Amino acid sequence: MFRLLSASLVLLFLTINALAQAPATGSDSCAELKTRADRAETRLKDWPQLSRYHDDNTKVNPPAKNEQRVVFMGDSITDGWDAPNMGGFFPGKPYVNRGISGQTTSQMLIRFRPDVIDLKPKVVVILAGTNDLAGNTGPTTLDAIQGNLISMAELARANGIRVVLASLLPVSDYEMRDGKPIVQTVRRSPDKIIALNTWMKNYAATNHLIYLDYFSAMVDGKGFLKDELSNDGLHPNAAGYAVMNPLAEAAIQSSLKHGK
């Protein structure tokens, strides 16, 4: 893991230098290049993005008596859940969104304490792993992803937090309007998605956790994400989140009653 982290930092450093030195072209103004360089520098200084929710976390009060607070830990699929055009993130519920777009399980594990444990929820819903498969922070293995998920689950349980492990969503290849395809199934192998989901289901059963199965409700007859549930073959659209909402709510209630 140290080698992967070091490699990621080196790549980010090289990216910053390249962007800073690159000449402006027709589509890339100096301002655009500076913005991209600033983003890369921020990632270099804060690889797990601990700063993303730092201020928000300080404003979260201790849970009220009998409050059933839930934290959703995840990547862009969680991050985008409360976007204005997605139908709302469980309105009226004491649910906290701590998703960060593009993140892998390694990054989530580092920020698990400030973004989950310190908020003192009753339940955490973990949806993670698709960006690991895509290699967002470097090459990885199923064993490494599983290890990070186990570590998050163990940290939660050690702090009295019930755990819901959510399946990865299926993916599908998507053709943009200009004809350029987004080949999601190459970056995120359907076979590996199924293998990781199978492991999660078994791990949850063995350890008395709740397994939240989004996959079965969102996959088509060919094993891909249903076209009507996504606009890019990866992220849910409003219809996709409409499928996920009741499944998540049912899993949370089951965890509060029966999970550990």
Identify the meaning behind each predicted range.
Residues 1-71, 78-79, 83, 88, ...:
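N-terminal secretory targeting modules
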Residues 71-73, 96:
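Conserved beta-strand elements of the Class I
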Residues 80, 104-105:
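Short substrate-entry loop that stabilizes the transition state in hydrolases
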Residues 87-94, 109-260:
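Alpha-helical cap/lid subdomain in secreted, periplasmic
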